[in-house]
Design a protein with these regions (language model features):
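Glycine-rich phosphate-binding loops of nucleotide-dependent enzymes
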Residues: 2-269
Length: 269
C-alpha cells in the first residue's frame, strides 16, 4: 500500500505512570495511512505500555490519542476494535483447547449483527452471516498465512511459530484499518522470522488488505528492512524518530542500545 499524507493515528503528549514509575513521558507521534511504523527501544523503554494506551487497555493520565480524527483516549478496547484497531500481544492470548479455526472466528465476533435468539437457533440471517464470515476467514486469512493444514488442529498442540501465525490470523479476522503488532518475531527461528516479515509486508501492501501497521520489535534487521519510519524510546521518552537510516545512525539510539558503538544496524543480507 502506498503511504499517504493522511494521518490515521495521532498520539499527543502521552504520560503514563504506575505508582512512582514514569512509564511514558510526553510521547507524541503520528502514523500515516499505509505506513509500517516501528517502535524500538531497550527492554523497559515503554513500548508495550504505549501500545496498551493506543488500543485502550490503559488510559493515560495525560495526553490524547486520536484515530481517524476522533478522540479515542477514553474509549474502551472493544470500541476501538469496532473502529478498526486490532492487536497482537507479546504473550500469546489464544484458547489452547480450541481449534485454529475457532480461535480465528473469535476475531470476527465484533462484526456479527444477529441477535441472541437467531444466533442460538442458527437460522436465516445467522446462517448467512456464519457462511460469509467463514468464507472470509478461509479465503483471505488462512490462505494468506498458509495455515490450511492446521485449521482443525488444537492450538495448544501446535509449535510456537504456528501459534504466532494463529494470533496474527485472529487479529486480521477483525479486518482492521490498523494493526498493532507487539514483538511478532520474538521466539521464532530464522525461517519463521522471514515468513512473518513477509506476512507483515503482505498485510501492508496487498490490495486486499492495505493495512497500516504499528510494529514493536527487537529484531533490528527486520525493522530496518520493512519500516517506512521508526521511533525509538528509552526509559519512557522519545529519543529519535525518522527513516530507518536516520534512526539507526542517531547517536542517542546507538548509545541506548550499544553504548558508544559506531552503528546500530548489522544487516542480515
Amino acid at each position: 500500500m502506498a503511504v499517504t499524507n493522511e494521518v490515521q493515528l495521532q498520539v499527543n503528549n502521552i504520560h503514563m505512570a504506575f505508582g512512582g514509575v514514569q512509564a511514558l513521558m510526553g510521547i507524541s507521534f503520528e502514523v500515516k495511512k499505509g505506513e509500517i511504523f516501528s517502535i524500538i527501544g531497550p527492554n523497559g523503554a515503554g513500548k508495550t505500555v504505549l501500545l496498551n494506551c493506543i488500543n485502550g487497555l490503559y488510559h493515560p493520565q495525560k495526553g490524547k490519542v486520536e484515530f481517524d480524527e476522533k478522540d479515542i483516549t477514553q474509549s474502551r478496547p472493544y470500541q476501538r476494535a469496532k473502529m478498526g484497531i486490532s492487536r497482537t500481544f507479546q504473550k500469546l492470548e489464544l484458547f489452547k483447547g480450541a481449534t485454529v479455526l475457532d480461535n480465528i472466528r473469535l476475531g470476527r465476533h465484533i462484526h456479527l449483527k444477529t441477535g441472541l435468539l437467531s444466533g442460538s437457533l442458527y437460522f436465516g440471517k445467522t446462517a448467512r452471516e456464519e457462511i460469509e464470515h467463514r468464507d472470509f476467514i478461509e479465503r483471505e486469512i488462512i490462505d494468506l498465512l498458509e495455515i490450511e493444514h492446521i485449521r482443525d488442529k488444537m492450538v495448544g498442540m501446535l509449535p510456537y511459530g504456528l501459534q504466532k501465525r494463529v494470533e496474527l490470523a485472529r487479529a486480521l479476522a477483525l479486518n482492521p484499518k490498523i494493526i498493532l503488532l507487539d514483538e511478532p518475531l520474538a521466539g521464532l527461528n530464522l525461517e519463521e522470522v522471514e515468513d512473518m516479515a513477509r506476512f507483515i509486508l503482505d498485510i501492508n501492501e496487498e490490495e486486499r488488505w492495505q493495512t497500516t501497521c504499528v510494529l514493536v520489535e527487537h529484531d533490528m534487521g527486520v525493522v530496518m528492512d520493512i519500516s517506512h519510519r521508526v521511533m525509538a524510546l528509552n526509559f519512557g521518552e522519545k529519543i529519535a524518530e525518522g527513516t530507518p537510516l536516520e534512526v539507526q545512525k542517531n547517536p542517542n539510539v546507538i548509545k541506548a542500545y550499544l553504548g558508544e558503538a559506531e552503528d546500530l544496524y548489522v544487516t542480515r543480507r
